[in-house]
UniProtKB/Swiss-Prot annotation:
It is found in: Mitochondrion matrix. This is Carbamoyl phosphate synthase arginine-specific small chain. GO terms for molecular function: ATP binding; carbamoyl-phosphate synthase (glutamine-hydrolyzing) activity; glutaminase activity. It comes from Phaeosphaeria nodorum (strain SN15 / ATCC MYA-4574 / FGSC 10173). Belongs to the CarA family. Heterodimer composed of 2 chains; the small (or glutamine) chain promotes the hydrolysis of glutamine to ammonia, which is used by the large (or ammonia) chain to synthesize carbamoyl phosphate.
């Protein structure tokens, strides 16, 4: 059936009987990084061997269909049936090898990098693949969808991301479920000593948020309203920005360690985004949020990593889950209404609700493992969700949380405008920010580096800040 796709050497070696959808191909790289023209032709097959090795665990052999690169990271799994382009570009997956439980991946190809009326990516959650590598059981040689412009194999090769097929992902997930998320490695076309510790780099030991956060403030305008929200970018998804601007809030995004409490008075609300890794690495963000809570009455909302950072700023603690929650169908109970919502989730840490002070209450709880899924302040307009109400992909059951936040922001803005002495003239800071172009996040690298790239320096807010933040230069 697939004999016309095999290399001559493979055909003469009698390998045809062993070839099916799971044995995938090496793709030609697009050195100019241009999106190719739409094509439904099957990707040529290469029988290059690849290995997926779990540290101190099983070794799986398969076939490479992505970049020829060796990487290591934390092996995690998602049970989502669809949405692999969104998942792979989600900054929360930075440093992780993503195992898909859905047996057939790649059947609808990869869409273009088209942008919507707000200048946001329509089909991706960031400009580049953020996962270190992917593991699938079967890869579809043929893809078909009206938005597709290239195959999953071509995309992975162009982005420098290794991918392996022909792996029994059921066995992988069973192991990870019982043993917990583990360090792992993908190797393409060569052998190595899997017992060497240096073959595995632990991304949890790195401040991953620093790698995916914007390097300088940028602005996304909304023509649908006059609210203005400051967003702390810990690795924000495009659909979070879209969920805010489509509701009439212009958004100014700041680096994760920006001293937001020093500029909060310029805004009508503060939002803390999702992000990858261990939240305890973000010590300066926690410090800045704590100062914000002490000096401001602004409405605040956090999602995923933002939820955890709010909890840490409030004095609570976080815990690492055994294998995390990564799916589009996880039930979360709203403790204020008793209603259950099906939610999209992607996190490996959770807030320990037993460490909350009396000012904070649980908002949501996970009905699968009883972990905390949200917080709400007893008297102030501050709340958070561990899951993703913006979905992309996933159900939209909880999208009303954005409506609730926008209502809080509008109420605060209306209250502030009732004071005649409040000036409506834009501050020099905001005038400066409106002229800034967005600085994209760095794409995932084939091998994880301990080196942290330098930050672009822009706006000086002055005054003492929490280490390790380094003030940025320019007039405020």
């Amino acid at each position: 059936m697939f004999s016309h796709l095999l290399k001559p050497a493979a055909r003469s070696a009698g390998l045809l009987g062993h070839v099916n959808r799971r044995y995938l191909a090496t793709v030609h790289t697009n050195t100019a990084r241009e999106i190719p023209k739409p094509s439904r032709k099957p990707t040529p097959i290469s029988l290059e061997n690849a290995t997926f090795t779990i540290k101190n665990g099983p070794i799986f052999s398969g076939k490479s269909f992505g970049a020829k690169a060796n990487i290591s990271g934390e092996a995690v799994f998602t049970t989502s049936l669809v949405g692999y382009p969104e998942s792979m570009t989600d900054p929360s997956y930075r440093g992780q090898i993503l195992v898909f439980t859905q047996p057939l991946i790649g059947n609808y190809g990869v869409p273009s990098s088209a942008r919507d009326e707000h200048g946001l990516l329509r089909y991706f959650e960031s400009p580049n693949i953020q996962a270190s590598g992917i593991v699938v059981q079967d890869y579809a040689l043929k893809h078909s969808h009206w938005t597709a412009v290239e195959s999953l194999a071509q995309w992975c090769a162009r982005e420098g991301v290794p991918a392996i097929s022909g792996v029994d992902t059921r066995e992988v997930v069973t192991y990870l479920r019982e043993q917990g998320s583990s360090l792992a490695r993908i190797t393409v076309g060569e052998e190595y000593d899997a017992d060497e510790d240096e073959a595995y780099i632990d991304p949890e030991a790195i401040n991953l948020v620093r790698r995916v956060s914007t390097k300088a403030p940028f602005h996304v305008s909304s023509s649908l309203g006059d609210m203005h929200v400051a967003l702390i970018d810990c690795g924000v998804k495009e659909n979070i920005l879209r969920s805010l601007v489509s509701r009439g809030a212009s958004v100014t995004c700041f680096p994760f360690d920006y001293p937001i409490h020093k500029v909060a008075h310029h805004f009508d609300g503060v939002f803390i985004s999702n992000g990858p890794g261990d939240p305890t690495h973000c010590t300066s963000t926690v410090y800045n949020l704590r100062k914000l809570f002490e000096t401001s009455q602004l409405p605040v909302m956090g999602i995923c990593m933002g939820h955890q950072l709010i909890a840490l700023a409030a004095g609570a603690k976080t815990i690492k889950l055994k294998y995390g929650n990564r799916a589009h169908n996880i039930p979360a109970l709203d403790l204020t209404t008793g209603k259950c919502h099906i939610t999209s989730q992607n996190h490996g840490y959770a807030v320990d609700p037993t460490t909350l002070t009396s000012e904070w209450k649980e908002y949501f709880t996970n009905l699968n493992d009883q972990s905390n899924e949200g917080l709400i302040h007893a008297s102030r307009p501050i709340f958070s969700a561990q899951f993703h109400p913006e979905a992309k992909g996933g159900p939209m059951d909880s999208s009303y949380l954005f409506d609730k936040y926008i209502q809080n922001v509008q109420r605060y803005k209306d209250h502030q405008s009732s004071f005649s002495e409040k000036s409506n003239k834009p501050s020099p800071l905001l005038v400066d920010l409106l002229s800034k172009e967005r600085v994209g996040v760095h794409p995932a690298q084939p091998d994880f580096e301990m080196h942290v790239p330098g930050r672009v320096e822009q706006v000086d807010v002055g005054g003492p800040v929490a280490p390790p933040y380094q003030p940025i230069t320019a007039a405020a």
